[in-house]
Protein backbone atom coordinates (compact mmCIF):
# COMPACT_ATOMS: atom_id res chain seq x y z
CA UNK A 1 0.00 0.00 0.00
CA UNK A 2 1.08 3.56 -0.63
CA UNK A 3 0.87 4.39 3.06
CA UNK A 4 3.70 1.99 3.94
CA UNK A 5 6.13 4.08 1.91
CA UNK A 6 5.48 7.45 3.53
CA UNK A 7 7.31 9.25 6.32
CA UNK A 8 5.99 11.35 9.24
CA UNK A 9 3.23 13.22 7.40
CA UNK A 10 0.83 15.36 9.48
CA UNK A 11 -2.46 16.74 8.24
CA UNK A 12 -4.54 19.67 9.41
CA UNK A 13 -7.39 21.67 7.94
CA UNK A 14 -6.42 24.30 5.39
CA UNK A 15 -5.30 27.41 7.24
CA UNK A 16 -3.67 29.42 4.48
CA UNK A 17 -4.38 30.10 0.84
CA UNK A 18 -2.06 30.29 -2.12
CA UNK A 19 -1.67 33.51 -4.05
CA UNK A 20 -3.15 33.64 -7.54
CA UNK A 21 -0.95 34.01 -10.58
CA UNK A 22 -0.60 37.48 -12.06
CA UNK A 23 -0.01 37.31 -15.78
CA UNK A 24 -0.48 39.46 -18.85
CA UNK A 25 -2.74 37.47 -21.10
CA UNK A 26 -3.47 38.47 -24.69
CA UNK A 27 -6.96 38.31 -26.15
CA UNK A 28 -8.08 34.90 -27.38
CA UNK A 29 -10.25 34.32 -30.42
CA UNK A 30 -11.98 31.15 -29.20
CA UNK A 31 -14.14 30.67 -26.12
CA UNK A 32 -14.09 28.58 -22.97
CA UNK A 33 -16.66 25.78 -22.78
CA UNK A 34 -17.85 23.73 -19.82
CA UNK A 35 -18.13 19.97 -20.41
CA UNK A 36 -20.38 17.96 -18.09
CA UNK A 37 -20.59 14.60 -19.86
CA UNK A 38 -16.95 13.57 -20.16
CA UNK A 39 -17.47 10.24 -18.41
CA UNK A 40 -17.05 8.98 -14.87
CA UNK A 41 -16.46 11.89 -12.49
CA UNK A 42 -16.29 10.36 -9.01
CA UNK A 43 -15.40 13.58 -7.18
CA UNK A 44 -17.40 16.13 -9.15
CA UNK A 45 -14.43 17.97 -10.67
CA UNK A 46 -15.46 20.65 -13.15
CA UNK A 47 -14.17 20.43 -16.71
CA UNK A 48 -13.59 23.45 -18.92
CA UNK A 49 -12.01 23.25 -22.33
CA UNK A 50 -10.55 25.75 -24.78
CA UNK A 51 -10.48 24.71 -28.42
CA UNK A 52 -8.60 27.25 -30.55
CA UNK A 53 -9.89 28.52 -33.86
CA UNK A 54 -6.52 27.45 -35.24
CA UNK A 55 -6.99 23.81 -34.14
CA UNK A 56 -4.31 21.50 -35.52
CA UNK A 57 -5.17 18.15 -37.04
CA UNK A 58 -4.54 15.46 -34.41
CA UNK A 59 -3.93 18.23 -31.88
CA UNK A 60 -1.98 18.04 -28.68
CA UNK A 61 -3.55 18.66 -25.27
CA UNK A 62 -2.36 20.74 -22.32
CA UNK A 63 -4.02 20.11 -18.95
CA UNK A 64 -3.64 23.34 -16.93
CA UNK A 65 -4.44 22.98 -13.22
CA UNK A 66 -5.22 25.97 -11.02
CA UNK A 67 -3.99 27.05 -7.59
CA UNK A 68 -5.90 27.17 -4.28
CA UNK A 69 -8.72 29.75 -4.28
CA UNK A 70 -8.80 29.32 -8.05
CA UNK A 71 -11.11 27.81 -10.64
CA UNK A 72 -10.74 26.45 -14.14
CA UNK A 73 -12.17 29.64 -15.67
CA UNK A 74 -9.91 31.73 -13.44
CA UNK A 75 -6.80 29.88 -14.60
CA UNK A 76 -7.98 30.29 -18.18
CA UNK A 77 -8.09 34.04 -17.62
CA UNK A 78 -4.82 34.33 -15.69
CA UNK A 79 -2.50 31.95 -17.53
CA UNK A 80 -1.13 32.11 -21.08
CA UNK A 81 -2.13 28.67 -22.32
CA UNK A 82 -5.27 29.59 -24.29
CA UNK A 83 -3.39 32.34 -26.09
CA UNK A 84 -0.54 29.94 -26.83
CA UNK A 85 -3.02 27.35 -28.09
CA UNK A 86 -4.07 29.77 -30.84
CA UNK A 87 -0.45 29.89 -31.94
CA UNK A 88 0.31 26.17 -31.71
CA UNK A 89 -3.11 24.59 -32.28
CA UNK A 90 -3.45 22.47 -29.13
CA UNK A 91 -6.49 22.05 -26.87
CA UNK A 92 -6.40 23.23 -23.24
CA UNK A 93 -8.28 21.43 -20.46
CA UNK A 94 -8.88 23.47 -17.31
CA UNK A 95 -10.07 21.25 -14.43
CA UNK A 96 -11.91 23.08 -11.64
CA UNK A 97 -11.69 21.95 -8.01
CA UNK A 98 -14.96 20.82 -6.38
CA UNK A 99 -13.91 22.03 -2.92
CA UNK A 100 -14.86 25.30 -1.23
CA UNK A 101 -11.26 26.46 -0.81
CA UNK A 102 -10.42 25.74 -4.42
CA UNK A 103 -7.52 23.40 -3.58
CA UNK A 104 -6.99 19.93 -5.00
CA UNK A 105 -7.15 16.60 -3.21
CA UNK A 106 -3.55 15.44 -3.20
CA UNK A 107 -3.88 13.75 0.19
CA UNK A 108 -6.38 10.87 0.02
CA UNK A 109 -5.64 7.28 -0.91
CA UNK A 110 -8.19 7.56 -3.73
CA UNK A 111 -6.48 10.44 -5.53
CA UNK A 112 -3.03 8.92 -5.00
CA UNK A 113 -4.05 5.66 -6.71
CA UNK A 114 -4.45 4.88 -10.40
CA UNK A 115 -8.18 4.50 -11.08
CA UNK A 116 -8.76 5.07 -7.37
CA UNK A 117 -11.82 7.29 -7.73
CA UNK A 118 -10.26 10.59 -6.62
CA UNK A 119 -9.63 13.95 -8.28
CA UNK A 120 -6.82 12.46 -10.35
CA UNK A 121 -9.23 9.88 -11.77
CA UNK A 122 -11.66 12.60 -12.86
CA UNK A 123 -8.90 14.59 -14.58
CA UNK A 124 -7.62 11.48 -16.35
CA UNK A 125 -11.11 10.85 -17.71
CA UNK A 126 -11.17 14.41 -19.08
CA UNK A 127 -8.04 13.59 -21.05
CA UNK A 128 -9.35 10.35 -22.52
CA UNK A 129 -12.66 12.04 -23.46
CA UNK A 130 -10.83 14.87 -25.23
CA UNK A 131 -8.60 12.48 -27.15
CA UNK A 132 -11.68 10.60 -28.36
CA UNK A 133 -13.86 13.64 -29.04
CA UNK A 134 -11.29 15.66 -31.00
CA UNK A 135 -9.01 12.99 -32.45
CA UNK A 136 -6.17 14.38 -30.36
CA UNK A 137 -2.71 12.84 -30.45
CA UNK A 138 -2.41 10.65 -27.35
CA UNK A 139 1.37 11.02 -27.51
CA UNK A 140 1.16 14.80 -27.20
CA UNK A 141 -0.64 15.26 -23.89
CA UNK A 142 0.98 17.50 -21.27
CA UNK A 143 0.16 18.63 -17.75
CA UNK A 144 1.07 21.76 -15.83
CA UNK A 145 -0.10 23.64 -12.77
CA UNK A 146 0.63 26.26 -10.15
CA UNK A 147 0.79 25.75 -6.37
CA UNK A 148 -1.97 23.25 -5.49
CA UNK A 149 -2.20 22.64 -9.23
CA UNK A 150 1.53 21.95 -9.27
CA UNK A 151 1.02 19.36 -6.55
CA UNK A 152 -1.69 17.77 -8.68
CA UNK A 153 0.62 17.88 -11.70
CA UNK A 154 3.09 15.68 -9.83
CA UNK A 155 0.24 13.41 -8.72
CA UNK A 156 -1.08 13.09 -12.29
CA UNK A 157 2.41 12.23 -13.55
CA UNK A 158 2.67 9.50 -10.90
CA UNK A 159 -0.86 8.07 -11.07
CA UNK A 160 -1.39 8.27 -14.84
CA UNK A 161 2.09 8.22 -16.39
CA UNK A 162 0.73 6.53 -19.50
CA UNK A 163 -1.35 9.61 -20.37
CA UNK A 164 1.33 12.31 -20.35
CA UNK A 165 4.48 13.04 -22.33
CA UNK A 166 5.72 15.89 -20.10
CA UNK A 167 4.85 18.06 -17.13
CA UNK A 168 5.81 21.45 -15.74
CA UNK A 169 5.45 22.13 -12.02
CA UNK A 170 5.22 25.70 -10.71
CA UNK A 171 5.85 25.75 -6.95
CA UNK A 172 4.48 22.42 -5.76
CA UNK A 173 5.49 19.45 -3.62
CA UNK A 174 6.43 15.85 -4.37
CA UNK A 175 3.74 13.36 -5.30
CA UNK A 176 2.56 11.83 -2.04
CA UNK A 177 4.08 14.46 0.23
CA UNK A 178 0.62 15.69 1.31
CA UNK A 179 -0.59 12.13 1.98
CA UNK A 180 -3.05 11.87 4.86
CA UNK A 181 -2.74 8.83 7.10
CA UNK A 182 -6.35 9.49 8.14
CA UNK A 183 -7.39 9.52 4.47
CA UNK A 184 -8.48 13.14 4.62
CA UNK A 185 -9.73 14.50 1.31
CA UNK A 186 -8.32 17.87 0.28
CA UNK A 187 -6.19 17.95 3.44
CA UNK A 188 -3.46 20.44 4.27
CA UNK A 189 -0.14 18.99 5.43
CA UNK A 190 1.96 21.50 7.37
CA UNK A 191 4.87 19.10 7.78
CA UNK A 192 5.24 18.78 4.03
CA UNK A 193 4.46 22.43 3.28
CA UNK A 194 7.21 23.60 5.63
CA UNK A 195 9.76 21.38 3.92
CA UNK A 196 10.16 18.92 6.78
CA UNK A 197 9.52 15.74 4.77
CA UNK A 198 13.02 14.85 3.63
CA UNK A 199 14.04 11.47 2.28
CA UNK A 200 16.09 9.77 -0.44
CA UNK A 201 15.50 9.76 -4.20
CA UNK A 202 14.91 6.03 -4.02
CA UNK A 203 12.26 6.37 -1.35
CA UNK A 204 10.51 9.20 -3.17
CA UNK A 205 10.55 7.12 -6.35
CA UNK A 206 8.96 4.19 -4.54
CA UNK A 207 6.16 6.48 -3.34
CA UNK A 208 5.44 7.65 -6.90
CA UNK A 209 5.67 4.17 -8.36
CA UNK A 210 3.30 2.75 -5.72
CA UNK A 211 0.56 4.99 -7.11
CA UNK A 212 0.33 2.75 -10.18
CA UNK A 213 1.49 -0.70 -9.06
CA UNK A 214 2.96 -2.86 -11.78
CA UNK A 215 3.30 -0.08 -14.35
CA UNK A 216 6.47 -0.41 -16.42
CA UNK A 217 5.84 1.88 -19.37
CA UNK A 218 7.14 5.33 -20.22
CA UNK A 219 6.80 8.28 -17.84
CA UNK A 220 6.47 12.00 -18.54
CA UNK A 221 9.58 14.12 -18.50
CA UNK A 222 9.38 16.73 -15.74
CA UNK A 223 10.43 20.35 -15.34
CA UNK A 224 10.29 21.70 -11.77
CA UNK A 225 10.13 25.43 -10.88
CA UNK A 226 10.36 26.82 -7.33
CA UNK A 227 11.20 30.11 -5.65
CA UNK A 228 13.93 30.56 -3.04
CA UNK A 229 11.78 32.67 -0.70
CA UNK A 230 8.55 30.68 -0.91
CA UNK A 231 6.95 30.76 2.55
CA UNK A 232 3.82 28.79 1.58
CA UNK A 233 5.52 25.69 0.19
CA UNK A 234 9.06 26.01 1.48
CA UNK A 235 12.01 25.73 -0.93
CA UNK A 236 13.04 22.33 0.44
CA UNK A 237 10.08 20.97 -1.51
CA UNK A 238 11.93 21.86 -4.71
CA UNK A 239 14.81 19.60 -3.76
CA UNK A 240 12.52 16.79 -2.66
CA UNK A 241 10.53 16.95 -5.90
CA UNK A 242 13.70 16.85 -7.97
CA UNK A 243 14.88 13.91 -5.87
CA UNK A 244 11.63 12.07 -6.58
CA UNK A 245 11.84 12.33 -10.33
CA UNK A 246 15.59 11.72 -10.36
CA UNK A 247 14.84 8.48 -8.53
CA UNK A 248 12.05 7.55 -10.92
CA UNK A 249 14.27 8.11 -13.96
CA UNK A 250 17.33 6.48 -12.43
CA UNK A 251 19.45 9.64 -12.40
CA UNK A 252 22.10 10.28 -9.76
CA UNK A 253 20.53 13.21 -7.93
CA UNK A 254 23.88 14.22 -6.44
CA UNK A 255 25.56 14.42 -9.86
CA UNK A 256 23.47 16.42 -12.36
CA UNK A 257 24.71 16.71 -15.93
CA UNK A 258 24.91 20.50 -15.79
CA UNK A 259 23.90 23.63 -13.92
CA UNK A 260 23.26 26.84 -15.83
CA UNK A 261 23.19 30.21 -14.05
CA UNK A 262 20.79 32.97 -15.13
CA UNK A 263 18.72 30.49 -17.15
CA UNK A 264 16.00 30.97 -18.35
CA UNK A 265 16.38 34.49 -16.94
CA UNK A 266 18.44 36.50 -14.46
CA UNK A 267 18.56 34.93 -10.96
CA UNK A 268 17.08 31.64 -12.18
CA UNK A 269 19.33 28.57 -12.11
CA UNK A 270 18.56 25.54 -14.26
CA UNK A 271 19.85 22.12 -13.21
CA UNK A 272 19.70 19.33 -15.77
CA UNK A 273 19.89 15.69 -14.69
CA UNK A 274 19.12 14.31 -18.13
CA UNK A 275 16.61 14.49 -20.97
CA UNK A 276 13.73 13.72 -18.61
CA UNK A 277 14.36 16.09 -15.70
CA UNK A 278 15.16 19.76 -15.21
CA UNK A 279 14.92 21.83 -12.07
CA UNK A 280 14.67 25.63 -12.18
CA UNK A 281 15.32 27.48 -8.91
CA UNK A 282 14.33 31.14 -8.85
CA UNK A 283 16.35 33.24 -6.40
CA UNK A 284 14.34 35.99 -4.73
CA UNK A 285 11.00 34.65 -5.99
CA UNK A 286 8.20 33.71 -3.61
CA UNK A 287 4.96 31.81 -4.10
CA UNK A 288 4.40 31.16 -6.90
CA UNK A 289 6.95 31.26 -9.70
CA UNK A 290 5.32 33.03 -12.67
CA UNK A 291 4.37 30.84 -15.60
CA UNK A 292 6.98 30.78 -18.35
CA UNK A 293 4.64 29.92 -21.20
CA UNK A 294 7.21 30.12 -23.99
CA UNK A 295 9.52 27.79 -22.08
CA UNK A 296 6.63 25.41 -21.46
CA UNK A 297 6.03 25.30 -25.20
CA UNK A 298 9.66 24.33 -25.73
CA UNK A 299 9.50 21.66 -23.01
CA UNK A 300 6.31 20.24 -24.49
CA UNK A 301 7.78 20.21 -27.98
CA UNK A 302 5.36 22.68 -29.57
CA UNK A 303 8.06 25.31 -30.16
UniProtKB/Swiss-Prot annotation:
Cell inner membrane is among the record's keywords: no
Any one Pfam family match given in the protein's UniProt record, by short name: Esterase_PHB
Matching InterPro entries: AB_hydrolase_fold (IPR029058), Esterase_phb (IPR010126), Plant_Biomass_Hydrol_Est (IPR050955)
GO biological process: cellulose catabolic process; xylan catabolic process
Sample GO molecular function, one term: acetylxylan esterase activity
PTM info: Glycosylated.
pH effect summary: Optimum pH is 7.0.
Catalytic activity as recorded in UniProt: Deacetylation of xylans and xylo-oligosaccharides
Subcellular location, record wording: Secreted
Major site of localization recorded for this protein: secreted
Entry EC number(s): 3.1.1.72
Transmembrane segments: none
GO cellular component: extracellular region
Subunit structure: Monomer.
Similarity remark: Belongs to the carbohydrate esterase 1 (CE1) family. AxeA subfamily.
Protein task: Acetylxylan esterase involved in the hydrolysis of xylan, a major structural heterogeneous polysaccharide found in plant biomass representing the second most abundant polysaccharide in the biosphere, after cellulose. Degrades acetylated xylans by cleaving acetyl side groups from the hetero-xylan backbone.
Protein name per its UniProtKB record: Acetylxylan esterase A
Organism: Aspergillus ficuum
Amino acid sequence: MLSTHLLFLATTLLTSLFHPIAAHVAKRSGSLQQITDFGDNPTGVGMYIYVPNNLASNPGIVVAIHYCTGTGPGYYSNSPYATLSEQYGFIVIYPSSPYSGGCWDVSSQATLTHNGGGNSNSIANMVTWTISEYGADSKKVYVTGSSSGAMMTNVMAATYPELFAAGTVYSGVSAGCFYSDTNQVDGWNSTCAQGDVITTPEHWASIAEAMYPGYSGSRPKMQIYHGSVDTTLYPQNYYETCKQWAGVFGYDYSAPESTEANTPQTNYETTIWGDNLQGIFATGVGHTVPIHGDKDMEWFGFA
